[in-house]
Amino acid sequence: MPVVKTKPTSPGRRHVVAVTNPSLHKGAPLASLTEKKRKNGGRNNAGRITVRHQGGGHKQLYRVIDFKRTKDGIPAVVERLEYDPNRTAHIALLKYADGERRYIIAPKGVSVGDAIASGQEAPIRVGSCLPLRNIPVGSVVHCIEMKPGKGAQIARSAGASAQVVAREGAYATIRLRSGEMRKVLVECRATLGEVSNSENNLRVYGKAGAKRWRGVRPTVRGTAMNPVDHPHGGGEGRNFGKHPVTPWGVPTKGYKTRKNKRTDKMIVRRRKAK
C-alpha cells in the first residue's frame, strides 16, 4: 500500500503521512453485519470518568467480525476488502458456498476473489484457519485463540503476527512480536499469515483534530495542573520535586503494577526477559 506524504497546503496538512489502499471497498458496509455502537465518553453507569482522554469522535457502526471461523469444510471467496473504523486492520467480506456472508480480519496478501477455508482439512495457505495441531511448526499465524472455541484474541491488530515455534503434547508454543513465548492448547485455532495494513505504524495524523475525529481527547501533563488536581501540580517553575506518580499517587515509570494470575504458568518467557 502506498504511503503518501501530503503537500503543506496548510499547517494541518504539513506533517500528514497517509496510508492509502486503492483496493478497499468505497461503499457502505454490509447492513446485516453491522450493529449500533454507543459511545460513553469514558464514563461508567454513574457518569464518572473511568477512562481518561476519551470522548467525541465520529459516529461509527460496529462491524460484526467472525473471530471463531466455525464454518468448517465450506469454501468461501473474498468478495471485497473494507476499511473498519473500529480497528487498525482491514477486514474482508467472505461469501461462503452456502450463500452466507461473514467479515474476518483481512490477512496480508489476500485479495478479492481469493479462496478462503477453515477447519482441520483446510489447505496450508494464507487465510486458512486451522487448529494449532494441524499447523506446521515455524508457520506465521495471527488471530489466535486462547481457549478453544472462544474466538481469536491474540495478534489481531494491523501487521500483527506470531510464530509457532514448538508443539509438545497438549500444548503448542508461540512466539509473539513482543518476544513473549506462550503455551496455547493445540485445539485452539489460528489463521495462517499476518494481519493486513502493516504500514499503519507509518501513519502520521498531522494535527490534533485528526485524533479528535477518532474520539481521543487531550492529555494534560500533571505538572501543568494545580495541586488539587494532581500530585505533580503547583509549585514555582517546572519542577514537581518528587518521584513521578499517577494522578492517584501510584508510582509510575518502571513501577510494576501487574498482579500474578492463574494463567502465568502459560507464559514460557516474558517479553522483557534478558
Swiss-Prot record:
Which parts of the sequence are annotated with region: Disordered?
221-256
A single Pfam family it belongs to is Ribosomal_L2
Entry's SUPFAM superfamilies? Nucleic acid-binding proteins, Translation proteins SH3-like domain
> Alphabetically, which GO biological process terms does the record hold?
cytoplasmic translation
**UniProt KW Ribonucleoprotein keyword:** yes
Question: So which residues are the signal peptide here?
Answer: none
**Intrachain S-S bonds:** none
May I have one GO cellular component term? large ribosomal subunit
- Kindly list the GO molecular function terms attached to this UniProt entry: rRNA binding; structural constituent of ribosome; transferase activity
**Keywords per UniProt:** Ribonucleoprotein, Ribosomal protein, RNA-binding, rRNA-binding
The record, for InterPro entries, names:
NA-bd_OB-fold, Rib_uL2_dom2, Ribosomal_uL2, Ribosomal_uL2_bac/org-type, Ribosomal_uL2_C, Ribosomal_uL2_CS, Ribosomal_uL2_dom3, Ribosomal_uL2_RNA-bd_dom
What domain of life is recorded for the organism?
Bacteria
Its function, per the record, reads: One of the primary rRNA binding proteins. Required for association of the 30S and 50S subunits to form the 70S ribosome, for tRNA binding and peptide bond formation. It has been suggested to have peptidyltransferase activity; this is somewhat controversial. Makes several contacts with the 16S rRNA in the 70S ribosome.
Self-association state and partner proteins as the record states: Part of the 50S ribosomal subunit. Forms a bridge to the 30S subunit in the 70S ribosome.
UniProt cross-references to NCBIfam families, sorted A to Z: rplB_bact
Similarity comment text for this entry? Belongs to the universal ribosomal protein uL2 family.
Q: Which HAMAP family is this protein grouped with? A: Ribosomal_uL2_B (MF_01320_B)
Instruction: Identify this protein by name.
Output: Large ribosomal subunit protein uL2
